[in-house]
């Protein structure tokens, strides 16, 4: 029976160009199943012939054979197929006429490899795969086609490489024809998808590289251009209306951005600034606001008034607030005699100043009215401010802080030099004698030496007073 089986398969394999491997395998297995009565088939689940054959291999007696008696004949693998005759000659039968176990294993491996190659090269799987997978499939198919075409030239080398690649000693991959159903439209769609993927990758690379571009390097001129937004034909909104709308919206946004709410911190800061400004307008004992309008001057700790205010004071415009005022001319006697403000007192030394104001302090009869003292010299830069500070310091020492005998002290800004040209009629005599006059050089030296002695005596008295305070318990 076995001889008839293999002779029939040999005749069928030799006739024509030869059927495929799977048809020959099925015929051979069906004949074996008819011969072997001990082979049982499960009718519940349909299986392939190879699966049936291997599933019940434990019950087969034909699998307990020896090794093959002859080597495989692989000379006919260049055609891409193998016939049943070549299979029977390569896998010998034992004495009982059954196939050897090694032959059956080779048949199983050949069937598995053939099924895998058919699944890999199916058109449906190629169409459903990604572009990268499609590209790899094309490369594998081209490689297999080129290898099958060159088998006729180099038989031995290509057989080894083909067997290593396929993992089977029997079967080879047949050359697959191109899918006839794959039309030009599908090919164009695949190429368009590949182009879109490549463009996206290029844009991502350009955007990432732009972050690390050096400022000194020139810009890349080969950057992809941005797509211009095409205007729709159905859009009937005029451009002027659009410009007006967006301009109005931009102004509204700017107004909202510039608006700032007042916080608690801002309120406290403004209150502190107002208090500081108000304190600058308060008198020395911080009880009232200054009666005369003040201006900024050279010394920030002193209050300055302009010539117009002094002229208004002399004309009696502040009688409702002021009971009595004094204009102290701190210049030397020859300057005072050369021209001075009406009613001004010439007190150029500290001793004279203290004796006039502090030996017997002047107190206003009306508590609601005030006593004002205005100091000046030629420019009101040194002598006038110095005498004003001396009187304030001595007044502080005689009273308990913040009480003062004379809380309102002012400096005439610009001195007699600025007052005389504007208000000459308020001067007696109507003339002006500068300090460095050529006719009064000796008097200038005498007055300076006298003032220096007085200044030294004053500093000595202050030091003695400090020592007495330190020694007292």
UniProtKB/Swiss-Prot annotation:
Lineage runs: Eukaryota, Metazoa, Chordata, Craniata, Vertebrata
Compositionally skewed regions (Polar residues) per UniProt: 145-158
Every copy of the Rhodanese domain together lies at 321-428
Instruction: Indicate the impact reported for residue 352 to K.
Output: Partial loss of HIV-1 Vpr binding
Positions of the catalytic residues: 377
Protein name listed in UniProt: M-phase inducer phosphatase 3
PANTHER family per UniProt: M-PHASE INDUCER PHOSPHATASE 3, M-PHASE INDUCER PHOSPHATASE DUAL SPECIFICITY PHOSPHATASE CDC25
Q: Where in the cell is it found?
A: Nucleus
- The Phosphoserine modification is found at 20, 38, 57, 61, 64, 122, 129, 168, 191, 198, 214, 216, 472
User: Where in the sequence is Phosphothreonine found?
Assistant: 48, 67, 130
Matches recorded under InterPro entries: MPI_Phosphatase, Rhodanese-like_dom, Rhodanese-like_dom_sf
Tell me what effect the entry lists for residue 129 to V: Loss of phosphorylation. Severely impairs PLK1-binding
Which GO molecular function annotation, any one, does this entry have?
Answer: protein tyrosine phosphatase activity
UniProt keywords, alphabetically: Acetylation, Cell cycle, Cell division, Host-virus interaction, Hydrolase, Mitosis, Nucleus, Phosphoprotein, Protein phosphatase
Report one GO cellular component. Answer: mitochondrial intermembrane space
Q: What is its EC number?
A: 3.1.3.48
How the protein assembles, per its UniProt entry?
Interacts with MAPK14 and 14-3-3 proteins. When phosphorylated on Ser-129 and/or Thr-130, interacts with PLK1. Interacts with MARK3/C-TAK1.
Where does this protein come from, organism-wise?
Homo sapiens (Human)
Q: Where is this region: HIV-1 Vpr binding site?
A: 334-379
Q: Which GO terms describe its biological process?
A: cell division; cell population proliferation; G2/M transition of mitotic cell cycle; positive regulation of G2/M transition of mitotic cell cycle; positive regulation of G2/MI transition of meiotic cell cycle; regulation of cyclin-dependent protein serine/threonine kinase activity; regulation of mitotic nuclear division
């Amino acid at each position: 029976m076995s001889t008839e089986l293999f002779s029939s398969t040999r005749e069928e394999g030799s006739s024509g160009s030869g059927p495929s491997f799977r048809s020959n395998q099925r015929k051979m297995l069906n004949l074996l199943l008819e011969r072997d009565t001990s082979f049982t088939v499960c009718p519940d689940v349909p299986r392939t012939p190879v699966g049936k054959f291997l599933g019940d291999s434990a019950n087969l007696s034909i699998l307990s054979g020896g090794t093959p008696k002859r080597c495989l004949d692989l000379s006919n693998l260049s055609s891409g197929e193998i016939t049943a005759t070549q299979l029977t000659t390569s896998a010998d039968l034992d004495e009982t006429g059954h196939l050897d176990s090694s032959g059956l294993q080779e048949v199983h491996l050949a069937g598995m490899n053939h099924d895998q190659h058919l699944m890999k090269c199916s058109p449906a799987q190629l169409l459903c795969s990604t572009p990268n997978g499609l590209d790899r499939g094309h490369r594998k198919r081209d490689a297999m086609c080129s290898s099958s075409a060159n088998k006729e030239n180099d038989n031995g080398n290509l057989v080894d490489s083909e067997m290593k690649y396929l993992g089977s000693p029997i079967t080879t991959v047949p050359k697959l024809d191109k899918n006839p159903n794959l039309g030009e439209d599908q090919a164009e769609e695949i190429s368009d998808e590949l182009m879109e993927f490549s463009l996206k990758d290029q844009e991502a690379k350009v955007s990432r590289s732009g972050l690390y571009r050096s400022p000194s390097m020139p810009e890349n001129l080969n950057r992809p251009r941005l797509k211009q937004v095409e205007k729709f034909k159905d859009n009937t909104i005029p451009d002027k209306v659009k410009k007006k709308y967006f301009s109005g919206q931009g102004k509204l946004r700017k107004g909202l951005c510039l608006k700032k709410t007042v916080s608690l911190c801002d309120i406290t800061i403004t209150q502190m600034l107002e208090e500081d400004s108000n304190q600058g307008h308060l008198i020395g004992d911080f009880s009232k606001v200054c009666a005369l309008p003040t201006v900024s001057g050279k010394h920030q700790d002193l209050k300055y008034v302009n010539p117009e205010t002094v002229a208004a004071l002399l004309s009696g415009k502040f009688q409702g607030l002021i009971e009595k005022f004094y204009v102290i001319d701190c210049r030397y006697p020859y300057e005072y005699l050369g021209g001075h403000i009406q009613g001004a007192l010439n007190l150029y030394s500290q001793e004279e100043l203290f004796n006039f104001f502090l030996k017997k302090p002047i107190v206003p009869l009306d508590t609601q009215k005030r006593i004002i003292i205005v100091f000046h010299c030629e420019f009101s830069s040194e002598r006038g401010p110095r005498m004003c500070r001396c009187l304030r310091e001595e007044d502080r020492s005689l009273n308990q802080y913040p009480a003062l005998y004379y809380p309102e002290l002012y400096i005439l800004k610009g001195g007699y030099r600025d007052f005389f040209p504007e208000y000459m009629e308020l001067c007696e005599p109507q003339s002006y004698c500068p300090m460095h006059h050529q006719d009064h050089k000796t008097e200038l030296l005498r007055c300076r030496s006298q003032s220096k002695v007085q200044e030294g005596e004053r500093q000595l008295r202050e030091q003695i007073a400090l020592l007495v305070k330190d020694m007292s318990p």
